[in-house]
């Protein structure tokens, strides 16, 4: 996803060393990329773009976050959707980014800083812990809740089979319900 906080899509397409393979239809700043190894790419390090699955690139356009709104990204790490929400808000309003897992919250913070997001604050708490502080506060809430990982069958079937179980699916469903219940309390 091209980070429109730092560069517009046309300019990025002119300078990128990546092999682009067309636009992702549901996000004007997302492109299909043929070569995905980007760790040392200076444009990636500078936050000009963020690698994410095309399916993840649909979240910010569907959320329709706008300038001046109060937006919560409830399960925010590693930060791609957060950056897209911040870009849609054009740096105005309040973007609260929450990640309950400390190590993932640190990655989230690093990605937000690298991407030049200035209107965000990062929290490290479980959703049910922040409800009382933000009751009926947010205009929009994004909750990419942790899941059973079934989508990984496409990428790494062997690993996905090792980690998948009916018990894990049930645990994830219960966790997702808690997250959605918390989100409902915080939506204005």
Language-model regions: role of each:
Residues 1-188:
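S-adenosylmethionine
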């Amino acid at each position: 996803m091209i980070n429109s906080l730092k560069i517009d899509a046309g300019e990025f397409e002119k300078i990128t060393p990546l092999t682009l393979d067309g636009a992702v239809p549901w996000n004007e700043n997302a492109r299909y990329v043929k070569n995905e190894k980007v760790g040392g790419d200076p444009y990636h390090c500078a936050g000009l773009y963020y690698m994410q699955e095309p399916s993840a690139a649909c979240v910010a356009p569907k959320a329709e976050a706008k300038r001046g709104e109060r937006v919560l990204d409830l399960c925010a790490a590693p930060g791609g959707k957060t950056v897209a929400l911040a870009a849609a808000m054009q740096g105005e309003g309040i973007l609260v980014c929450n990640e309950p897992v400390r190590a993932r919250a640190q990655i989230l913070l690093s990605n937000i800083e690298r991407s030049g997001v200035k209107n965000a604050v990062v929290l490290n708490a479980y959703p049910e812990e922040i409800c009382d502080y933000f009751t009926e506060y947010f205009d929009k809430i994004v909750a990419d809740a942790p899941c059973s990982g079934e989508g990984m069958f496409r990428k790494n079937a062997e690993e996905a089979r090792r980690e998948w179980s009916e018990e894990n699916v049930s645990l994830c469903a219960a966790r997702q319900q808690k997250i959605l219940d918390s989100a409902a309390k915080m939506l204005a």
